[in-house]
């Protein structure tokens, strides 16, 4: 497989180091991605490993740092971080629309053209014309068609950390939030 990547960023400092702001954007293009591609049963084999696709990744990361106190015996700082990483399947082997990456029954993890990478594929809920889930006479959701029902990767991540240092004693706290992804 061949990879081309590009990255651009900025590091800004304000108020003599009291506030820092960092931003990074990167794009990675992978072609001839190595996949296990399914074969027709008539070939006598179930699949073949080959260079069979293109994937691109867009990444955004922002970090805001604040250091309100920085003296000889006492330091206090905070940092906030946001990151978003999106992978997309642009192309697979000729004639292949999606590739199963894991799972023998539904749901499965798959790579499909035009989808985020990877996705969870399985039975969806039946929906009416308004997009609402259809239920049976017992109030249970009715099964729909096979479809993308989730993503493996999160939509974004948020982070917060703080450090307090008094003389040579330091205490730190970290908080992480992941939105999306099953």
Task: For every predicted segment, state its role.
Residues 1, 37-47, 59, 133-144:
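Flexible, solvent-exposed coil segments and beta strand-coil junctions
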Residues 1-44, 83:
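Membrane-embedded beta-barrel scaffold of Gram-negative outer-membrane proteins
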Residues 1-20, 47-71, 116, 151-157:
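Outer-membrane beta-barrel signature, preferentially recognizing the C-terminal barrel domain
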Residues 19-21, 76-78, 160, 166, ...:
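Transmembrane beta-strands of outer-membrane beta-barrel proteins
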Residues 25-31, 66-68, 82-88, 166-168, ...:
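Transmembrane beta-strands of outer-membrane beta-barrel pores
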Residues 26-32, 39-50, 144, 150-156:
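Active-site beta-strand/loop architecture of penicillin-binding DD-peptidases
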Residues 30-36, 47, 73-75, 87-93, ...:
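Outer-membrane beta-barrel proteins
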Residues 50, 69-152:
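Conserved small-residue
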């Amino acid at each position: 497989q061949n990879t081309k990547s590009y990255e651009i960023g900025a590091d800004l400092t304000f108020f003599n180091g009291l506030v820092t702001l960092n931003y990074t954007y990167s794009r990675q293009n992978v072609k001839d991605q190595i996949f296990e591609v399914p074969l027709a049963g008539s070939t006598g084999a179930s699949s073949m490993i080959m260079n069979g696709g293109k994937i691109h990744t867009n990444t955004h990361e922002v970090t805001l740092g604040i250091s309100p106190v920085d003296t000889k015996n006492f330091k206090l700082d905070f940092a906030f971080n946001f990151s978003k990483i999106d992978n997309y399947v642009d192309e697979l082997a000729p004639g292949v629309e999606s590739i199963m990456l894991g799972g023998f029954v539904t749901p499965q993890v798959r790579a499909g053209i035009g989808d985020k990478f990877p996705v969870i594929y399985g039975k969806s809920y039946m929906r009416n014309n308004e997009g609402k889930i259809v239920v049976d006479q017992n109030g249970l959701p009715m099964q729909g068609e096979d479809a993308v029902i989730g993503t493996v990767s999160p939509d974004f991540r948020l982070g917060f950390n703080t450090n307090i240092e008094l003389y040579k004693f330091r205490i730190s706290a970290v908080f992480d939030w992941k939105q999306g992804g099953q």
